[in-house]
Amino acid sequence: MAPDLDQRIETYYVRVRGTVQGVGFRHATVRQAHALGIKGWVANLDDGSVEAMLQGSANQVDRMLSWLRHGPPAARVTEVSGEERSTEKRYERFEQH
């Protein structure tokens, strides 16, 4: 029997580029992560992009990635890139760094 995709925990590292700083992107990301039950963190990078670590079920992560492709209304996302990460670490909450 195949494992239930909503039970296995996935961890994704994501970079979001575009107009994503100074537009409430991190704050909105925290709100969306809480709404979806995602754990991890989000942070600004010096190059003007935003990075995030997402942890949750496949369905939760997919829904969060879909939201990140647009972000909050003031954001202008031009690129979302990421990769699944293998880790034993389990985040307790979703935080803004």
UniProtKB/Swiss-Prot annotation:
It catalyses: an acyl phosphate + H2O = a carboxylate + phosphate + H(+). Pfam families: Acylphosphatase. Residues 82-97 have a biased composition (Basic and acidic residues). It comes from Paraburkholderia xenovorans (strain LB400). InterPro entries: Acylphosphatase, Acylphosphatase-like_dom, Acylphosphatase-like_dom_sf, Acylphosphatase_CS. The lineage of its organism: Bacteria, Pseudomonadati, Pseudomonadota, Betaproteobacteria, Burkholderiales. Belongs to the acylphosphatase family. This is Acylphosphatase. Its EC number is 3.6.1.7. Keywords: Hydrolase. The active site is at R26, N44. GO terms for molecular function: acylphosphatase activity. Residues 76-97 are annotated as: Disordered. The gene is acyP. It is an enzyme of class 3 (hydrolase). The keyword GTP-binding does not apply. Residues 11-97 form the Acylphosphatase-like domain. PANTHER family: ACYLPHOSPHATASE. It comes from the Bacteria.
